[in-house]
Regions:
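Outer-membrane beta-barrel transmembrane strands
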Residues: 1-2
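Generic structural signal for small/hydrophobic residues in well-ordered secondary structure
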Residues: 5, 23, 28, 53-54, ...
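Non-catalytic, well-ordered alpha-helical segments in soluble enzyme domains
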Residues: 6, 59, 68-105, 152
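Histidine-centered active-site microenvironments of extracellular/periplasmic hydrolases
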Residues: 10-72
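Generic recognition of well-ordered alpha-helical segments
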Residues: 51, 72-83, 96, 100, ...
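WW-domain-binding short linear motifs
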Residues: 111-115, 195
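Low-complexity, glycine/alanine/valine/leucine- and proline-rich hydrophobic stretches
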Residues: 127-144
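Long, internal low-complexity/basic segments
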Residues: 162-208
Length: 208
């Protein structure tokens, strides 16, 4: 992969396009590589699958900047439009990353990351995930909910969703998920009963 990336960059330089071309290196998913006894990509919400690289080189922007804000691949389209001097159409998901290429975090930037997997035949293995810096909550409509402390348990080895002492965290993370579902117009509520499998708590507006 390093060699092929080098070939692409070399060709851009050969054609004289380096100074007016934005280069983005990313991927659509990670690989478990044996973590959690899993290989390849999977129908799970572990970091190995969902924490992917995103490297952007843009002419005229600062070099060597590393940002730890939550970004998603849906942010790429608005970024490309912004770089080209175009307006992002109303209703488009995602936000431009151009300010971050100068080391600036836009005001009101998201404080969580949201991921979705639609499984097979709409329901089998379907799941949703919302993650803050400290907590990750995974909603599995037809399985066990998951809650991980990403600071003390970055390997996601200890599911806290069934512990009574973390019910308040579940409620808080569930509200964050509802906000994400509304923002991305997720239709999962039309498929499932919206009942969490942890202590019979419901995922509904009535919890707000």
């Amino acid at each position: 992969m390093d060699s092929l990336t080098g070939q692409i960059l070399g060709k851009l330089e050969e054609l004289g396009l380096t100074e007016n071309t934005m280069v983005v290196f990313s991927t659509d998913h990670g690989d478990m590589l044996g973590s959690h006894r899993l290989f390849n990509k999977g129908f799970n919400m572990y970091e190995e699958d969902h924490h992917i690289p995103l490297i952007i080189a843009c002419p005229g922007k600062a070099e060597g900047i590393s940002m730890d804000s939550f970004v998603n691949t849906v942010d790429l389209m608005p970024t490309f439009l912004d770089a080209a001097g175009c307006e992002t159409p109303a209703g488009v998901q995602g936000k431009s990353l151009m300010p971050m290429l100068e080391g600036k975090v836009p005001q009101g930037w998201r404080q969580e990351s949201f991921s979705e997997f639609n499984g097979y035949e709409s329901t089998l293995l379907t799941s949703r995930m919302v993650r803050t810096r400290k907590w990750k909550y995974v909603y599995n409509p037809f399985g066990q909910d998951e809650l991980y402390d990403m600071e003390s348990d970055p390997g996601e080895l200890h599911n806290l969703a069934e512990l009574l002492g973390f019910v308040h965290v579940l409620r808080r993370m569930r509200k964050k998920m509802l906000g994400c579902l509304r923002e991305y117009e997720d239709s999962i509520a039309e498929v499932t009963s919206w009942q969490s499998n942890s202590y019979g708590l419901f995922l509904s507006d009535r919890e707000e």
